[in-house]
């Protein structure tokens, strides 16, 4: 055959040139349109195309559905029709011809090997039988020869000894008979052994033939999934209907093959089945109640443990006795017995500590693994950048003192701002944090309130500070909040610098201030103490530079240092909820550097720092030690005083925050339960108690705490203040709804209600009050509580009459003829009868007459007749005291 080009071959085969080139490429030949094609290459292409054309599906799956209706008789003679659908699936696999040939060859070889084994077994059995027959024939010949010799000897004895006794003959005959019986038994045993051997040989041959037939049927294609005994329902009637439908559809197909395949197995199973298998087969055929079959392959049983199992018991900080028993897989009574042996009595629901649980578990032979509840929290807090060198930092100075002693004004002059004039009432109502640059260095100031309601805020200020500047007015001296500030400073262990303010006033007396402070342990340096006293005037600016120098000198003595590099930590000075920015927290950084984007954990809250601002409202990207900043991005408003820590993983920060919330909730509930149990008897004995319900909203968290503490302290035995809800931010619709449901007063401190809340307030006619000064809020709540107090009853004597004589009246009984000696006697007023200045009766004046006329009152110096209600033992000389009850309205002190 001559070579042709690819293009000509494509025209001859009536295919495109590109397709032919692709087919050549698939066959492993690289060609272009103008290349020539040899005869060998054509043969290669043809073989490739034949292989592709001959490749078909190797597996064929057939699916069939059969539907039938089954009428099931029901109650009342009614029958119910049930639709039954039987789904069957058969898969046929196409065998490879080479694989089929290989399987046929293997099968032929196996059959030949089995036939050879069968022939060898038969020949072996024949040889053994022949050898056995020869042995038996030889033994038989020996026996016959012996018997013949015996008979000959017997005949000789009989001929020679004719005179032998008959008993000897009988004995010999008996002996011969026994020998014959023994020989017969031996022969039968040998025949039985030969028969068993032949049966064993036949059984081996039959088993080999059966296995060959099974292998023959296994080599043919069979369906992958056998659904012959599969039912879609458990009802006996439904299963019978399914089987009947299968028989109708299948017909006689496949029966002969299945019968042939099953016949040898059935024959072989007759000897191989055990008693348990036969019992299970009978149970499967017999079924149970309702026709349910039990699968023979589902064998299950419980074996009792023969030895104790030692477990690893994980124990938290607290655990109940029942939970401990579950962890050890024992009964609760056993744990209680073990505790009683150790000398501890407990119930199944009692909570025990970790140490007790460890002792009990180890006593019962288990291994204890102690787990701390705050393990994750400790791991998160300890995973920090450490090792950086500490550097000097600016001091944190807290301004403390009594209200109106000039703390904020003094700080104003230092910062050259006018913060005090902008505050409501001219008093500071939350902590202000500022840092100022001086000629000698930077100082961070914390301005705390001086009012008594802000004790907790002053305590937080003292804990976060390095130096306390105690401001005392020279004209006012030491006041209650001044003493409290001294106590906070001593409790925090920080040095105190005293600023004697208002020194420019004519009535200023600095020496008096020194004397009063010395009584509380604050001694000036000139008296041998450790406190610096500086005379200043916030109004005129006198002594400000000396105060700053004193602060920096004290800071230099303290040698304040902090790590500037690394993950930051600090404290929340103040927090509030801004309507546009969300939760805002004022944070004082103690060490490290706080960056924008850091993940912070703050008490119960967490979040990523989205923005940072300084006290001037300017955006900053980082804040070092002793720098106060406002941060945005927390999940909620944190509590003032909470520790702020930068962590690495936001997921772990969230887990720690949720754990803290849960723990706080548990402690709170436990405390409430304890107080309920302790006050149970008091609640049973006390009478009706009025409550003033308040929903409080304020601008910052510190104000919420201060106002709540002040209002709760106003509670008395008769009227109690109850804070139904409190929070930071404006008054919302939820707050108004809560107030309406609990009949509470809505109080807004430096916040206002939104539009939706105002609608609810108007529709429900709620009492809404706005305040900007805490004095006014407390005074009005006192007035509301005073209105709920029950009035005080006071007895006022209005008249006194002396009994001169007693006479009888058929209508009123004993009538006392009296002379009014003091005041006025009124009818129907309560009276007391006195005898020798001792009250002998207290009742009501029923009848009052003067000269037979009923009168309402009798004045001093007049005679009258008095009838006492339900009392007839009036004597001459008694005194009748007339009084009235006056209600006096009480107030909350």
From Swiss-Prot:
Binding site for GTP: 401-408, 447-451, 501-504
PROSITE patterns to which the protein is assigned, alphabetical: G_TR_2, IF2
The UniProt record lists the keyword Protein biosynthesis: yes
G3 as annotated region, ranges: 447-450
GO MF terms held by the record: GTP binding; GTPase activity; guanosine tetraphosphate binding; translation initiation factor activity
Keyword Metal-binding in annotation: no
Compositional bias (Basic residues): 254-269
Region span, G4: 501-504
Highest taxon, organism lineage: Bacteria
Name this protein carries in UniProt: Translation initiation factor IF-2
Alphabetized Pfam families for the sequence: EF-G_D2, GTP_EFTU, GTP_EFTU_D2, IF-2, IF2_assoc, IF2_N
Compositional bias (Polar residues): 68-82
Region (Disordered): 49-303
Entry-linked InterPro entries: DNA-bd_dom_put_sf, EF-G-like_DII, EFTu-like_2, IF2_assoc_dom_bac, IF2_II, IF2_N, P-loop_NTPase, Small_GTP-bd
Region annotation G2: where it falls in the sequence: 426-430
NCBIfam families found in the cross-reference section: IF-2 (TIGR00487), small_GTP (TIGR00231)
Bias (Basic and acidic residues): 93-159, 166-216, 270-283
Family assignment from sequence similarity: Belongs to the TRAFAC class translation factor GTPase superfamily. Classic translation factor GTPase family. IF-2 subfamily.
Chain segments carrying region G5: 537-539
Function per UniProt: One of the essential components for the initiation of protein synthesis. Protects formylmethionyl-tRNA from spontaneous hydrolysis and promotes its binding to the 30S ribosomal subunits. Also involved in the hydrolysis of GTP during the formation of the 70S ribosomal complex.
One of the record's GO cellular component terms: cytosol
Keywords: Cytoplasm, GTP-binding, Initiation factor, Nucleotide-binding, Protein biosynthesis
HAMAP family cross-referenced by the UniProt entry: IF_2_B (MF_00100_B)
């Amino acid at each position: 055959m001559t070579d042709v080009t690819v293009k000509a071959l494509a025209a001859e085969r009536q295919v495109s040139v590109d397709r032919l080139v692709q087919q050549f490429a698939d066959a492993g030949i690289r060609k272009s349109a103008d290349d020539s094609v040899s005869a060998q290459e054509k043969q290669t292409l043809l073989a490739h195309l034949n292989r592709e054309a001959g490749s078909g599906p190797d597996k064929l799956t057939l699916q069939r559905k059969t539907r039938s209706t089954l009428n099931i008789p029901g109650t009342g003679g009614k029958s119910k029709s049930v639709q039954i659908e039987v789904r069957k699936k058969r898969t046929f696999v196409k065998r490879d011809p080479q694989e089929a040939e290989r399987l046929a060859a293997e099968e032929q070889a196996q059959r030949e090997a089995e036939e050879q084994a069968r022939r060898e077994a038969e020949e072996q059995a024949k040889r053994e039988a022949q050898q056995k027959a020869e042995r038996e024939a030889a033994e038989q010949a020996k026996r016959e020869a012996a018997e013949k010799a015996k008979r000959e000897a017997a005949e000789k004895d009989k001929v020679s000894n004719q005179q032998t006794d008959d008993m000897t003959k009988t004995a010999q005959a008996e002996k011969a008979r026994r020998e014959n019986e023994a020989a017969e038994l031996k022969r039968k045993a040998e025949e039985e052994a030969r028969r068993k051997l032949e049966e064993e040989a036949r059984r081996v041959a039959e088993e080999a033939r059966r296995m060959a037939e099974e292998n023959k049927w296994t080599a043919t294609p069979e369906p992958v999934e056998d659904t012959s005994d599969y039912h879609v329902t458990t009802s006996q009637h439904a299963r019978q209907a399914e089987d009947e439908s299968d028989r109708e559809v299948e017909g006689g197909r496949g029966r002969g093959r299945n019968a042939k395949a099953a016949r040898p197995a059935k024959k072989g199973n007759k000897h191989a089945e055990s008693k348990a298998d036969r019992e299970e087969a009978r149970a499967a055929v017999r079924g149970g109640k309702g026709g349910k079959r039990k699968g023979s392959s589902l064998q299950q049983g419980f074996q009792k443990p023969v030895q104790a199992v030692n477990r690893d018991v994980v124990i938290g900080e607290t655990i109940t006795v029942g939970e401990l028993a579950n962890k050890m897989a024992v009964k609760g009574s056993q744990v209680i017995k073990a505790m009683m042996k150790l000398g501890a009595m407990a119930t199944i629901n009692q909570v025990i500590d970790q140490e007790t649980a460890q002792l009990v578990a180890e006593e019962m032979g288990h291994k204890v693994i102690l787990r701390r509840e705050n393990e994750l929290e400790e791991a998160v807090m300890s995973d920090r950048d450490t090792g950086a060198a500490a550097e000097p930092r600016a001091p944190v100075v807290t301004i403390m003192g009594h209200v109106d002693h000039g703390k904020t004004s003094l700080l104003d002059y230092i910062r050259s701002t006018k913060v005090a004039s902008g505050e409501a009432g001219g008093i500071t109502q939350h902590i202000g944090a500022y840092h100022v640059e001086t000629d000698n260095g930077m100082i961070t100031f914390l301005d705390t309130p001086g009012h008594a309601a802000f004790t907790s805020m002053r305590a937080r200020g003292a804990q976060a500070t390095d130096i306390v500047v105690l401001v005392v007015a020279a004209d006012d001296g030491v006041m209650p909040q001044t003493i409290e500030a001294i106590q906070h400073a001593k409790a925090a262990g920080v040095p105190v610098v005293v600023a004697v303010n208002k020194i420019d006033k004519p009535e200023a007396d600095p020496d008096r201030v020194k004397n009063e402070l010395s009584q509380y342990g604050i001694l000036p340096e000139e008296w041998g103490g450790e406190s610096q006293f500086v005379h200043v005037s916030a109004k005129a600016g006198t002594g400000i530079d000396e105060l700053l120098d004193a602060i920096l000198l004290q800071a230099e003595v303290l040698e304040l240092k902090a790590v500037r590099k690394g993950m930051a930590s600090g404290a929340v000075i103040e927090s509030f909820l801004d309507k546009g920015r969300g939760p805002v927290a004022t944070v004082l950084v103690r060490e490290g550097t706080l960056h924008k984007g850091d993940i912070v954990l703050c008490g119960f809250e967490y979040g990523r720092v989205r923005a940072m601002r300084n006290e001037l409202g300017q955006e900053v990207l980082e804040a070092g030690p002793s720098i106060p900043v406002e941060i945005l991005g927390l999940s909620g408003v944190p509590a003032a005083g909470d520790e702020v820590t930068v962590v690495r993983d936001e997921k772990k920060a969230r887990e720690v925050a949720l754990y803290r919330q849960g723990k706080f909730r548990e402690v709170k509930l436990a405390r409430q339960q304890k107080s309920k149990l302790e006050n149970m008897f008091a609640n049973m004995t006390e009478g009706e108690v009025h409550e003033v319900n308040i929903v409080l909203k304020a601008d910052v968290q510190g104000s919420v705490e201060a106002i709540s503490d002040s209002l709760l302290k106003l509670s008395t035995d008769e009227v109690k203040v109850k804070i139904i809800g409190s929070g930071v931010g404006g008054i919302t619709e939820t707050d108004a709804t809560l107030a309406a449901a609990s009949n509470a007063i809505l109080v807004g401190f430096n916040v206002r209600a939104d539009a939706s809340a105002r609608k609810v307030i108007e529709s429900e006619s709620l009492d809404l009050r706005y305040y900007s000064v805490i004095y006014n809020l407390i005074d009005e709540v006192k007035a509301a509580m005073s209105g709920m107090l029950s009035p005080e009853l006071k007895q006022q004597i209005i008249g006194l009459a002396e009994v001169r004589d007693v006479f009888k009246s058929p209508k009123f009984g004993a009538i006392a003829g009296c002379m009014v000696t003091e005041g006025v006697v009124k009818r129907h007023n309560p009276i007391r009868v006195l005898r020798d200045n001792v009250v002998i009766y207290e009742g009501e004046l029923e009848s009052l007459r003067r000269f037979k006329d009923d009168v309402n009152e009798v004045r001093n110096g007049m005679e009258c007749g008095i009838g006492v209600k339900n009392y007839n033992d009036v004597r001459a000389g008694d005194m009748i005291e007339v009084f009235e009850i006056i209600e006096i309205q009480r107030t909350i002190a």
